[in-house]
Amino acid sequence: MLELGEQPYTEADAEWDAFVAAHPHGSLLQTTNWARLKNRFGWTSQRVWLRRDGRLVAGAQVLFRSLAFGVVKMAYIPHGPLADWDDEEQLAVLFNQIDQAAYRRGAGLLKFEPRLWEDECPPDQWAALYRRHGGAPSADTIQPPRTVVVDLRPSEDDILAAMKQKTRYNIRLAEKKGVTVREGTAADLPAFNRLMAASLLCLRSGQRWS
């Protein structure tokens, strides 16, 4: 029998983080530390979970933030919920619990982006899954929808040879213009922060780097 629960992120942190770490789709974005970080930037956090025989089996760390001058509140689940996506009963109970939690917090929009590979859940199955649980797929994503995994064991020449010609051209062009790559340290954080701020400004204004 499934037991439902809801709690602020500050409670039972160790148990929740252990659940996230052990889950096959677990992510930094569902951890206590991520909730603490987001809370510093205007988000609030709530956890919804399911237990079976006293053990956590599914759940979601939901982030909330007001949009449009406080008129609308958004509920967002990055890289979640964490669940057994083949267990329809579990998913139905979990999404109902999430919907209720979002409603109680005044959210007018719920967005979730599970950390699933396409071979686990192809796009057509995604669409059906969203609709079964009251949602709809969206092309507007917050988290990067794709990840590139590169095997670093071959030689550099072999790795480059496996890339598209345009990619190789851009890499060599950057080298000719003096671009270098190195591992950063804590001393680089201020410069990185300035770069991120400038990138965000360009994104919001529609300008391009020059």
Identify the residue ranges that each predicted region occupies.
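A conserved beta-strand-loop-helix scaffold within acyl/acetyltransferase catalytic domains
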Residues: 2-71, 114-121, 128-210
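Acyl-donor binding region in acyl/amide transferases
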Residues: 70-140
